[in-house]
Curated annotation (Swiss-Prot):
Main location: cytoplasm
Catalytic activity: isopentenyl diphosphate = dimethylallyl diphosphate
Organism taxonomic ancestry: Bacteria, Bacillati, Bacillota, Bacilli, Lactobacillales
Pfam families: FMN_dh
Record text on subunit structure and interactions: Homooctamer. Dimer of tetramers.
Subcellular location: Cytoplasm
Protein name, UniProt field: Isopentenyl-diphosphate delta-isomerase
Residues reported to bind FMN: 65-67, 95, 124, 185, 215, 259-261, 280-281
Highest rank taxon of the organism: Bacteria
Protein's gene: fni
An annotated GO cellular component: cytoplasm
Binding, Mg(2+): 155
Cofactor(s) needed: FMN; NADPH; Mg(2+)
Record-level GO BP terms: isoprenoid biosynthetic process
């Protein structure tokens, strides 16, 4: 694939992600009910939102992987880096595979660090890459951590996608040699417990469930196919909420992404065991539709509302939130029982 073809594909992904963005997502958060406390017995001043992670993050949300690899997406990354710095949140790069193949594309990713010089940045490579490529991706961004993304469904549907999914040896090798923490993530199809246990056996400690319900790469890649012949996979995978249930009790540090649309979605994900919650589509949508300044104001208010919701629930930190009363829908409870998953 030529540089122009690679760049065009990256631009297509951004265009289609926005085209198919849904303001009401289907990630399962509507099936989770947090119960109102008439006597919260707390104050907003007492709330500590700092996540229970060894990353020194100040907030339980972060900007998750999106883009890079073309002049247009490089400009988006510059804005995203600037936004992360202004909000004081971590940010993950889009897949750096194209820049590892073509050094001329490195600036479209490195602009993240240029605009967020002191922030926490996660580099990003696919699980098909070896340890040397992972090290190069980290160096490219002077990254604080590395995401390894799992995207089998996307690759299957992508006309020019990979067809080799022998990934576990690569993941194990990257973990063994990495100088930074590793987060293994799905890109929109979620996890089942068996695969999470396999990752644990490889030495993985941090997992982003990347559940179904948000940016849908099955739909995006199918739209790029001339025959649109994979439409039946648009609902493939486990939702973000189902994936969090699959992860409960394993001892992994879970991050939750996929279909997060509101501060309440964030709090629900945290209550289900996520240590932090990432957003991609919502951030991209606001940047494209409203511009940088309005997006910054929106997410500043978003962070403030997280504090308000904690106080409303009568909790002051993540540990206390784990005891907040919660009810699952009948369908979600049936899923939990059918899969033999721990209770909440």
């Amino acid at each position: 694939m030529t540089q122009s073809q690679q760049s065009h594909r990256k631009d297509e992904h951004v265009f289609l992600a926005e085209k198919y963005f849904q303001s009401v997502a289907h990630a399962g958060f509507d099936q989770v009910r947090l119960l109102h406390r008439a006597l919260p017995e707390t104050t907003m001043a007492a709330v500590d939102l700092k996540p229970d992670l060894p990353f020194n993050w100040q907030w339980p949300i972060y900007i998750n992987a999106m883009t890079g690899g073309s002049p247009q997406t490089g400009k988006l990354n510059a804005q995203l880096g600037q936004l992360a710095q202004a909000l004081g949140v971590a940010i993950a790069s889009g897949s750096q595979s194209v820049a590892l193949r073509d050094p001329q594309l490195v600036p479209t990713f490195a602009t993240l660090r240029d605009h967020d010089p002191n922030g926490f940045i996660l580099a990003n490579v696919g699980a098909g890459h070896h340890a040397t490529a992972a090290e190069a991706a980290v160096a490219m961004l002077k990254a604080n951590a590395l995401e390894i993304h799992l995207n089998a469904a996307q690759e299957v549907i992508m006309p020019e996608g990979d067809r080799d999914f022998m990934w576990q040896a690569n993941i194990k090798s990257i973990i063994a040699t990495s100088q930074v923490p590793i987060v293994v993530k799905e890109v929109g199809n979620g996890f089942i417990r068996e695969d999470l246990q396999s990752l644990q056996q490889l030495g993985v400690q941090f997992v982003d469930v990347g559940g179904r319900g948000g940016t849908n790469f099955a739909t995006i890649e199918n739209a790029r196919r001339s025959g649109h012949d994979f439409a039946y996979l648009q609902d493939w995978g486990q939702t973000t909420v189902e994936s969090l249930l699959e992860a409960r009790g394993l001892g992994l540090a879970m991050l939750a992404t996929g279909g997060v649309r509101s501060p309440l979605d964030v709090v629900k994900a945290l209550r289900l065991g996520a240590h932090a919650v990432g957003m991609s589509g919502l951030v991209l949508h606001h940047l494209i539709q409203t511009g940088y300044e309005a997006t910054l104001a929106y997410f500043q208010n978003f962070l403030h509302q997280l504090r308000q919701l904690y106080a409303l629930l009568g909790v002051t930190n993540w540990q206390e939130l784990q005891e907040a009363p919660i009810v699952l829908s009948a369908d979600l409870e049936h899923y939990r029982q059918a899969r033999g998953l721990p209770g909440i």
